[in-house]
């Protein structure tokens, strides 16, 4: 409860760093639907912000598909309580909407969204989050921004800033933010498959062991592929082209 007596989210910012193929988009879809139906934000707006329209569309379609994921939601959908419009997806009972937007700082200025999903933040060069968050913070009593990523190869961009921030002692004691950083601590740990759950906590379900092992084995003779495997699958920020693992190292 804030100083005005309004019930608000305790957590304003969440950073989720999770290995590729772990179902981040599906997880975000359930968060959006929960907000649209139960968030109490009459007339509120939610956004997915991605580096291009294709990726934004992927998350948007995940949310739309989830509207048919249960009997109750399917009834809502069939009776046009969930409605697709030119602007996005609307839950007509509360006039809450979900829209997609590309990573564009100018377009982000002056918004007033209540829930913001920043997808694949490892692709962002500049920090668009503050442009969006500023509008939410100033105009919404109850707002939340979620930054999701599998890690990536772009250095000194938004991703590196978020990792540094959410690993800091200051952020550890910040009650208004929360970080879930699933990643290896160093590249030596990749040689033992038992450590892979540090970056892929649901491995075996999403993603499948066989798929990750295949990528790992393909990368053993290729430094560039090793960089990508360590970055996207194991959450390690990589920038050089050394050999990190060979078939002889594998456990």
Task: Label every PLM stretch briefly.
Residues 1-8:
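Pre-Walker A adenine-sensing motif
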Residues 8-31:
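Walker A/P-loop
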Residues 35-43:
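Post-Walker A helix-loop "phosphate-sensing" segment adjacent to the P-loop in P-loop NTPases
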Residues 44-65:
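Conserved Walker A/P-loop ATP-binding site and its immediately adjacent core
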Residues 61-114:
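Inter-Walker segment of RecA-like/P-loop motor cores
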Residues 119-120:
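Walker B catalytic acidic pair
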Residues 123:
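Residues immediately C-terminal
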Residues 127-251:
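Non-catalytic, compositionally simple segments
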